[in-house]
């Protein structure tokens, strides 16, 4: 018999591995950054829940849309690093969400496509 946390962590690990697999196919330069996101999820209690929430926000708002071809982010590794640097112990994720909004705005701006 396993604990509830074990089941939740198992589900998270499976998703993390899936994101690594997608990075290998879609943006190999981002593999190391995606692997390193695992260090965001650690500890117990509030710290653990906050790290997991921040991880899901970065994956859902940057990595997954990039891998799906919805977000034209050419340097996902740098975007993940920037988002991780903005992650603070804030349950509302204000700093992280602001940083992600800026990253997404830069990626979708006409100037971003002119540089390519």
Predicted regions and their residues:
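C-terminal amphipathic alpha-helical interaction region
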Residues: 1-116
């Amino acid at each position: 018999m396993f604990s509830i946390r074990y089941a939740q962590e198992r589900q998270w690990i499976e998703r993390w591995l899936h994101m690594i697999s997608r990075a290998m196919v879609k943006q190999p330069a981002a593999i190391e950054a995606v692997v390193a996101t695992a260090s965001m999820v650690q500890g117990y209690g509030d710290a653990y829940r906050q790290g997991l929430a921040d991880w899901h926000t970065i994956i859902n708002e940057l990595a997954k849309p990039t891998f799906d071809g919805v977000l034209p982010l050419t340097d996902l590794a740098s975007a993940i690093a920037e988002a991780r640097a903005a992650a603070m112990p804030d349950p509302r994720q204000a700093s992280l969400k602001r940083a992600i909004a800026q990253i997404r705005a830069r990626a979708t701006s006409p100037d971003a496509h002119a540089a390519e």
